[in-house]
């Protein structure tokens, strides 16, 4: 695990153009706890600061320079957002933001997920974050995506467990997360899987 985290940190830091000797010295001086905190904090910040403003979800692409040649700054990814939701929960737990700030973000995210396009209960690969409408993944892939939906469902389970024992306001969030999850019972998807379709659910 430590080797994995060290490699991940080196990868992040190499983007800054430092020499490899400086990188080794920087990570060698970190304790295991400090290294874990660095990785978790930077992961959290990507999903917190880089979120699409309306939905609060993870962008499909994040251009540091703010230039989006394909005019897709508002496109969000369902699977990446599943990772992001769990990273935000970790960030709340570690005190990177207050519980109140975290709850407000989670309420925005879960509200978006409850209203966004779905197909037989499955979420699409991409949405337009400002509308919740599907952005087709390809010419013949404009419906639900089972793999990406699994990441969202896992995140909704984490939200439910994290807030289930919280304040009265926090306890309202698991109910919404459950409603989203219950819509994810996919008999149509199971039939598709049985005939060899692994990813797409038709629109």
Predicted features along the sequence, with ranges:
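Extended ligand-binding clefts on enzyme/binding-domain cores
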Residues: 33-35, 121-149, 165-203
């Amino acid at each position: 695990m430590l080797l994995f985290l060290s490699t991940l940190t080196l990868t992040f830091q190499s983007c800054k153009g430092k020499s490899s000797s400086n990188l080794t010295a920087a990570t060698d001086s970190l304790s295991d706890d400090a290294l874990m905190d660095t990785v978790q904090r930077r992961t959290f910040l990507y999903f917190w600061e880089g979120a699409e403003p309306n939905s609060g979800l993870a962008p499909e692409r994040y251009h540091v320079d703010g230039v989006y040649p394909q005019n897709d700054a508002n496109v969000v990814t369902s699977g990446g957002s599943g990772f992001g939701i769990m990273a935000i929960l970790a960030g709340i737990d570690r005190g990177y933001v207050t519980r109140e700030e975290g709850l407000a973000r989670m309420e925005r995210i879960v509200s978006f997920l409850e209203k966004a396009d779905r197909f037989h209960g499955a979420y699409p690969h991409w949405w337009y974050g400002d509308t919740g409408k599907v952005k087709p993944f390809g010419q013949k892939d404009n419906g639900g995506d089972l793999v990406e939906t699994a990441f969202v469902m896992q995140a909704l389970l984490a939200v439910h467990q994290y807030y289930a024992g919280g304040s009265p306001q926090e306890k309202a969030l698991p109910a919404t997360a459950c409603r989203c999850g219950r819509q994810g019972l996919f008999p149509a998807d199971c039939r598709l899987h049985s005939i060899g379709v692994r990813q797409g659910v038709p629109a």
